[in-house]
């Protein structure tokens, strides 16, 4: 099922790029709202295909890039990739729904709904996310 205009919490992305301009790793996280600082709170990613901060792209092939500014369009590309149940666990949200149930429940909510009713504190900070990306 394709969900058009699906609401999302605030996401941050990290990319590892090889010397030959291949994207070798993608990190994805959920931050708190407001001004971001190294101490900004991170939340458990509520959907599938992410473990800790690491995105599993499965058989999806990430594009090669010619310059770093091309990374700007990569979040859209990633969010359009097909999802499955890989790495999905019901206990990653306060709602404890199966994946299809979660998507159906969230499809008409706004982004703030995540912070009030869905997200669980990861007990990590944005600085932890940046450190993971830098490894």
Regions of interest found by a model, annotated:
Residues 37-101:
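Glycine-centered motif in EGF-like
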Residues 91-135:
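Charge-rich (especially acidic), low-complexity segments
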Residues 6-9, 16-18, 29-31, 46-50, ...:
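Generic signature of intrinsically disordered, low-complexity segments enriched in small/polar residues
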Residues 1-66:
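Compact alpha/beta protein-protein interaction domains typified by the UBC
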